[in-house]
Amino acid sequence: MSGVAAVSRLWRARRLALTCTKWSAAWQTGTRSFHFTVDGNKRSSAKVSDAISAQYPVVDHEFDAVVVGAGGAGLRAAFGLSEAGFNTACVTKLFPTRSHTVAAQGGINAALGNMEEDNWRWHFYDTVKGSDWLGDQDAIHYMTEQAPASVVELENYGMPFSRTEDGKIYQRAFGGQSLKFGKGGQAHRCCCVADRTGHSLLHTLYGRSLRYDTSYFVEYFALDLLMESGECRGVIALCIEDGSIHRIRARNTVIATGGYGRTYFSCTSAHTSTGDGTAMVTRAGLPCQDLEFVQFHPTGIYGAGCLITEGCRGEGGILINSQGERFMERYAPVAKDLASRDVVSRSMTLEIREGRGCGPEKDHVYLQLHHLPPAQLAMRLPGISETAMIFAGVDVTKEPIPVLPTVHYNMGGIPTNYKGQVLRHVNGQDQGVPGLYACGEAACASVHGANRLGANSLLDLVVFGRACALSIAESCRPGDKVPSIKPNAGEESVMNLDKLRFANGSIRTSELRLNMQKSMQSHAAVFRVGSVLQEGCEKISSLYGDLRHLKTFDRGMVWNTDLVETLELQNLMLCALQTIYGAEARKESRGGPRREDFKERVDEYDYSKPIQGQQKKPFEQHWRKHTLSYVDIKTGKVTLEYRPVIDRTLNETDCATVPPAIGSY
């Protein structure tokens, strides 16, 4: 039986009385299980405490490890820990298969060599180049070397990959992928399940997770980390269904909450992509890294923002302007439509700016697929055919799809090393935060640097979700003593929740959120300029101040979505602040975004010339470095620091460092 399905039925079957006077007795009667598992072997050890507030009794739980988030990264970390014998909780604000991983379309990269000779070192080279040399090469080494085994593991779990005629996993071409270190032409490295790879991957991992005795806390909203003496000792969460507060104490905590795409007005992200983990880390006084690097996917449906996978171009689709030109030949003569995403998005924007856009407003371009055989479209791109008809009214076998770059992915996030350990930077040195890990889009390992290659995100999920579990298993044993917390731990989180629940200002949550999203869209888009960024900083800071004037309408605790959306808005605001202040401070153009007032990349050397005889620029005078951002929660003031990019690989004899160069496609 599905553990989470059992959860749902159990919750529906018995609803607790929600008056505060009845809570404590209800929790203690033992008539309702708090830990929902696959086979029901575990007994609840929950204890009720009123140390924080008599109005909000807190239910305490204890685990070896807690994973926050149940998308691809969270599920892989959770069942990896359970498989190793750890008593593991998985806290998720969504039913696992509703996580945003399900929306990924194109595929997952791995140098399997099923279509032609391939090598993971070529994949490594492409990823470093795609990152515009802001990626950490030790983490990229780890990810690309682990990629083939990770895909085979998924196949063994039952993931139904598309196949070649001889039964091998089918691999399509994807942007920025090459053979022989960029000298051997286009690589076919992207393993896929038609154009629904994320859907298949998430359901495969979810099905696998049900083999293990993991405790699921479904539709619980994580409020904050429980930090003591610089260590993470768990999380405090709100049960959305009944409004109860839960402290989940654990020796190790893994954040896998996804990205913060909803800081922007037009994006491919689900409405639940609200940067919850990123904000939790910020409130804990820890840094976030490289949040200014936001990826604009070249092909979102014009007017809707829905994703049209890069796999369309991998299958032979082409971008055309109003004159019918295949314009990418001008900007990327070799890769053309399969250049990296930053190159394609900027090229599309330039075509529109120069008057060659399509439609009455000349404000988009076309993605043409109707020159491809209908049988190929039906087999390789069935989801896109359906999406284009629903959201654009287009029959892809007869007419092109109107597309426009739209926010798609966050390269930045919580800084980690290649083992998934969350980092702080002290006196020029990286230090791990005891008990805290992160993976997936919430994390910044940094394998994507300033620009992610398509189909590396699903790879990131499974490789680093697994890495977190392995790293914890190396440093801890199941049943190790769980550190204690103060009796009033989480008090500030409950006070904040109460304040928002009874907020009676003048601004609706939806109104303030829309103002933030439109400001980010207009002030921090693909092309950026200093004066506009400065105006955006002032605007977002002002909007952050407006959080004090919010008005909520639902005062209850049962399924209070008004309260949950307001908590999510707080999280989005923290992400937006760090994004726009980091963007304003970075006086160069690197990766996804492009500064029109600083059009060149600023490295420690001028790599357009031989470096012999050049003097290396001091760290303070170049921008090949990671941004670390902190926010004063009370004032909204953003503080920026910087840490070096890691250029060494894990083993130089096995995988040589790729030295910086001027990127071209």
Curated annotation (Swiss-Prot):
Where is the PTM N6-acetyllysine found along the chain? 168, 180, 183, 336, 481, 486, 499, 518, 539, 551, 599, 609, 625, 634, 637
One GO MF term: flavin adenine dinucleotide binding
E.C. number, please?
1.3.5.1, 1.1.5.-
Alphabetized UniProt keyword annotations: Acetylation, Electron transport, FAD, Flavoprotein, Membrane, Mitochondrion, Mitochondrion inner membrane, Oxidoreductase, Phosphoprotein, Transit peptide, Transport, Tricarboxylic acid cycle, Tumor suppressor
**SUPFAM superfamilies associated with the record:** FAD/NAD(P)-binding domain, Succinate dehydrogenase/fumarate reductase flavoprotein C-terminal domain, Succinate dehydrogenase/fumarate reductase flavoprotein, catalytic domain
Q: Which reaction does it catalyse?
A: a ubiquinone + succinate = a ubiquinol + fumarate; (R)-malate + a quinone = enol-oxaloacetate + a quinol; (S)-malate + a quinone = enol-oxaloacetate + a quinol
- Name positions with the PTM Phosphotyrosine: Y216
Q: Which residues carry this modification: N6-succinyllysine?
A: K180, K336, K486, K499, K539, K616
State the pathway, as annotated in the record.
Carbohydrate metabolism; tricarboxylic acid cycle; fumarate from succinate (eukaryal route): step 1/1
Tele-8alpha-FAD histidine modification sites?
H100
Where in the cell does this protein reside? Answer: Mitochondrion inner membrane
EC category: oxidoreductase
Question: What Gene Ontology cellular component terms go with this record?
Answer: mitochondrial inner membrane; mitochondrion; respiratory chain complex II (succinate dehydrogenase)
What is the activity regulation comment for this entry?
Answer: Enol-oxaloacetate inhibits the succinate dehydrogenase activity.
Known post-translational modifications?
Phosphorylation at Tyr-216 is important for efficient electron transfer in complex II and the prevention of ROS generation.
Q: Which InterPro entries match?
A: FAD-dep_OxRdtase_2_FAD-bd, FAD/NAD-bd_sf, FRD_SDH_FAD_BS, Fum_R/Succ_DH_flav-like_C_sf, Fum_Rdtase/Succ_DH_flav-like_C, SdhA/FrdA/AprA, Succ_DH/fumarate_Rdtase_cat_sf, Succ_DH_flav_su_fwd
Which of this chain's residues are annotated to bind oxaloacetate? H297, R341, H408, R452, A455
**Residues that bind FAD:** A70, A73, T92, K93, S99, T101, G106, A222, D276, E441, S457, L458
**Any idea which residues are catalytic in this one?**
R341 (proton acceptor)
Q: What is its main location?
A: mitochondrion
Protein function: Flavoprotein (FP) subunit of succinate dehydrogenase (SDH) that is involved in complex II of the mitochondrial electron transport chain and is responsible for transferring electrons from succinate to ubiquinone (coenzyme Q). SDH also oxidizes malate to the non-canonical enol form of oxaloacetate, enol-oxaloacetate. Enol-oxaloacetate, which is a potent inhibitor of the succinate dehydrogenase activity, is further isomerized into keto-oxaloacetate. Can act as a tumor suppressor.
Q: Which family does it belong to?
A: Belongs to the FAD-dependent oxidoreductase 2 family. FRD/SDH subfamily.
Name of the protein in question: Succinate dehydrogenase [ubiquinone] flavoprotein subunit, mitochondrial
What species does this protein belong to?
A: Bos taurus
